[in-house]
Amino acid sequence: MNTFFKLTALAGLFAITGHAFAVDDITRVDQIPVLKEETQHATVSERVTSRFTRSHYRQFDLDQAFSAKIFDRYLNLLDYSHNVLLASDVEQFAKRKSEVGDELRSGKLDLFYDLYNLSQKRRFERYQYALKVLERPMDFTGTDTFNLDRSKAPWPKDGAELNALWDGKVKYDELSLKLTGKDEKEIRDTLTRRYKFAIRRLAQTNSEDVFSLAMTAFAHEIDPHTNYLSPRNTEQFNTEMSLSLEGIGAVLQMDDDYTVINSMVAGGPASKSKAISVGDRIVGVGQTGQNMVDVIGWRLDDVVALIKGPKGSKVRLEILPAGKGTKTRIVTLTRERIRLEDRAVKMSVKTVGKEKVGVLDIPGFYVG
């Protein structure tokens, strides 16, 4: 069911004492990487395809009809809201949808990479357009409507129709912030940061992102509970299943271009140091005997990979404390094996009338 929202009336540079942190804006489409399949992906594709076609409990033929279904799923994973690609883009690639099965068997995934690269280009164009729309005077006096769910809608037939969709999206974003009490300047500043951040994320995509999405489309078309796990996702899955990891015991999240401490595991290295607080930002990571690496603007999973390491090894963090006008400091932590107790089963006994009832709280499933 489509959802409509009725519109009615109603920094690249962050300066801190002693330091200046800057993340360059992406202003040209040639700054977005053209992604290509890596050597190992061909082998993995061949093996995954062989395993799925021979051993999956759901028997299927990887024929032209099934290939078309994988293509459609992949296309919708790339552009779920049908507001990035044009109808002509979709038509151009749809001519090749019957080739999907052959590409998966051979490991030569040209269609997946070509379509992904085009979607990256189109997404860059959309956010650049949105930034220009922000320069217009804001007007909430009309009775416009904005469709929040376009997953079943046709792709726009031309640039004018696509621009009209994004005019509505920007106005919806503006009004959403207006309803929180922000003034016009605050709204523009917030959305400018948001759209530029989205553009910078485009420049951080890599070949593994494309391959994982292609394999996910394949797996989910066979069965919604079948998944492909990339090496990094496999590591995360193993952590969740064992409820343990080797690191500093901190939960991180992104806030604009900063990696922020969201919470800390009690008894972990970060918590025990007393030198790190929730809300602090990690702006640099250094290994023993190596220079500090500036991680402002990095993908969160890349920052996490840099911080994690073997038990007993040391990691240096350049911490920018929460708040404005603060200076960075270096905190050295020794990595430990962290037990994720908050995700383990908890038991309690409740008194109900004259009876006692045992209650198990199961946050998730794990081994051991």
Show which residues each predicted segment covers.
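Surface-exposed patches in mature extracellular/periplasmic domains of secreted proteins
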Residues: 56-66, 81-89, 111-112, 126-141, ...
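Active-site-surrounding "flap" and adjacent substrate/cofactor-binding loops of secreted or lumenal enzymes
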Residues: 79-106
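Boundary at the C-terminal end of the N-terminal hydrophobic targeting segment
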Residues: 20-22, 189, 205
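PDZ/PDZ-like domain segments forming the peptide/carboxylate-binding groove
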Residues: 76-77, 98, 112-128, 138-172, ...
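Cleft-lining beta-strand/loop regions that shape enzyme active-site pockets
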Residues: 36-37, 53-62, 200-207, 223-245, ...
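Gram-negative bacterial Sec-dependent N-terminal signal peptides
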Residues: 1-21
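N-terminal-proximal low-complexity accessory segments that begin disordered
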Residues: 37-79, 89
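Acidic/histidine-rich, surface-exposed loop or edge segments in extracytoplasmic proteins
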Residues: 24-34, 45-57, 95-99, 193-197
